[in-house]
């Protein structure tokens, strides 16, 4: 082995090719591990032998291809392990649900969620929160904020008595996730106890 490869960053869906120079006499045999688990010969990671290098290929990279690899290269003289770290660059996964709705009033509601399980190789920069008045149609999503930094947000300016759905999207420098949606719509209204208070 002439050198150790650095961390490889590859965009989701692209093909990763890593050329690793070697010195010695073939033929060589290869065994691949990912995160300390042996991968079968028929797995997605392909290792090809050339005169003075080996070529590691992962086609159509998926999120699950990210991780730490170890490639054991062996010939009649001995063996060595080549470490290879793969980072998949992609938009984050959706925020982790459920999307909880609390503190519902006649003109507001508070949303809470958890961060995505996969940030796509880059830090989550924030969240986009959207609302939909169900009386306006299935595509009437309106952004409430495009720069929420926390995993909770109080949606303002709801209309008393109207029914709403909500959704939250995560974003990073690579793009925007699919949305996490509320499981069912809620009606903006005063809680029953507050209505009784105002009647008295």
Locations of regions flagged by a protein language model:
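Extracellular beta-strand/loop-rich beta-sandwich domains predominantly from IgSF
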Residues: 7-9, 43-64, 68-77, 117-118, ...
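Flexible inter-domain hinge/linker segments at boundaries of tandem extracellular adhesion modules
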Residues: 1-5, 34-41, 48-53, 75-77, ...
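Beta-strand-rich modules
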Residues: 155-176
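Conserved aromatic anchor
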Residues: 107-122, 200
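Extracellular Ig-like/FN3 beta-sandwich strand-entry sites
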Residues: 15, 25-27, 64-68, 79, ...
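Acidic, Ser/Thr
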Residues: 20-25, 74, 114-120, 132
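Solvent-exposed loop segments of extracellular immunoglobulin-like
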Residues: 26-33, 109, 123-127
């Amino acid at each position: 082995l002439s050198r150790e490869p650095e961390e490889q960053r590859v965009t989701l869906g692209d093909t990763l090719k890593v050329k690793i120079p070697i010195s010695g006499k073939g033929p060589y045999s290869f065994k691949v591990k990912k995160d300390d688990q042996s991968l079968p010969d028929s797995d997605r990671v392909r290792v090809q032998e050339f005169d003075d290098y080996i070529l590691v290929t992962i086609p159509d990279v998926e999120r699950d291809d990210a991780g730490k690899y170890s490639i054991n290269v062996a010939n009649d003289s001995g063996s060595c392990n080549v470490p290879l770290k793969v980072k998949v660059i992609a938009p984050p996964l959706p925020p982790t649900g459920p999307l909880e709705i609390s503190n519902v009033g006649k003109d507001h509601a508070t949303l809470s969620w958890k961060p995505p399980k996969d940030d796509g190789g880059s830090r989550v920069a924030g969240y986009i929160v959207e609302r939909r008045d169900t009386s306006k149609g299935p595509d009437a999503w309106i952004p409430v904020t495009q720069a929420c930094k926390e995993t909770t947000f109080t949606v303002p300016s709801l209309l008393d008595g109207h029914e709403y759905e909500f959704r939250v999207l995560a974003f990073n420098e690579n793009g925007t996730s699919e949305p996490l949606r509320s499981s069912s719509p809620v009606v903006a209204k005063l809680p029953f106890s507050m209505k009784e208070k105002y009647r008295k």
